[in-house]
Design a protein with these regions (language model features):
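Interfacial/gating helices of multi-pass transporter permease domains
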Residues: 1-12, 79-85
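Small-residue-enriched core segments of transmembrane alpha-helices in multipass membrane transport
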Residues: 9-10, 89, 122-131
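Short, function-defining helix-loop hinge/capping sites that tune catalysis or transport
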Residues: 17, 107, 121, 129-133, ...
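A short pocket-lining beta-strand/turn micro-motif at the edge of beta-sheets
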Residues: 23, 114-116, 126, 132, ...
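Short alpha-helical transmembrane segments in multi-pass integral membrane proteins
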Residues: 29-94, 135-179
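Transmembrane alpha-helical segments of integral membrane proteins
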Residues: 102, 128-137
Length: 179
């Protein structure tokens, strides 16, 4: 229980970065959809993608390079420390995927497409988590538990990017044309 709690504290600390990017971009996207400024939407999206990519690599590096020190903020040496460190190494790849998933969910909300936004959120935080928590521990033991969220986020990113390419850009173009 202690290891899960520590991992979740680290997770929620870092996810705040991605939430901030999504929350900051959403009103800019919404406003510019309404005003028909497609170029500003593209610019905001491009800057968001770049910021997410850089943040994701940095957060992954921090979690792996300084993970021990971060864990020591919560617990001293011992079994819990070693369990948490082993878990963090398996869990940390989540930081490569989660930023884009959170952003694209917020992006579709900003476009007024709540269905796709909810689909992305449901896949990454419920549907695929339940699916992988049922499958991965049977295949990989305890390691599968720690890999559940990274796997859910990794699969979701492919679906979210597909939805962005299929509906995100065309939705904006149609909305801007009809304005």
């Amino acid at each position: 229980v202690a290891a899960v709690t520590i991992i979740m504290y680290i997770y929620y600390f870092f996810i705040a970065v991605y939430m901030g990017i999504a929350v900051a971009a959403a009103p800019i996207v919404s406003y510019n959809v309404g005003s028909g400024n497609y170029e500003k939407i593209k610019e905001t999206t491009r800057y968001s993608f770049i910021t997410i990519a850089i943040s994701s690599v940095l957060i992954l590096a921090i979690s792996l390079l300084y993970g021990r020190e971060i864990i020591h903020l919560f617990v001293g040496d011992g079994n819990v420390f070693h369990l948490t460190w082993d878990a963090l190494k398996l869990f940390s790849p989540v930081f490569l995927f989660i930023g884009l998933n959170v952003f694209l969910s917020g992006y579709f909300t900003a476009l007024g497409n709540g269905f796709i936004s909810a689909l992305i959120s449901s896949l990454r935080s419920l549907i695929l988590v339940v699916l992988f928590i049922l499958i991965l521990p049977k295949l990989l033991g305890v390691s599968g538990v720690w890999m559940t969220m990274p796997m859910a986020e990794a699969v979701t990113i492919f679906i979210a990017v597909y939805l962005y390419r299929a509906y995100g850009k065309s939705y904006i173009k149609e909305t801007v044309r009809s304005s």
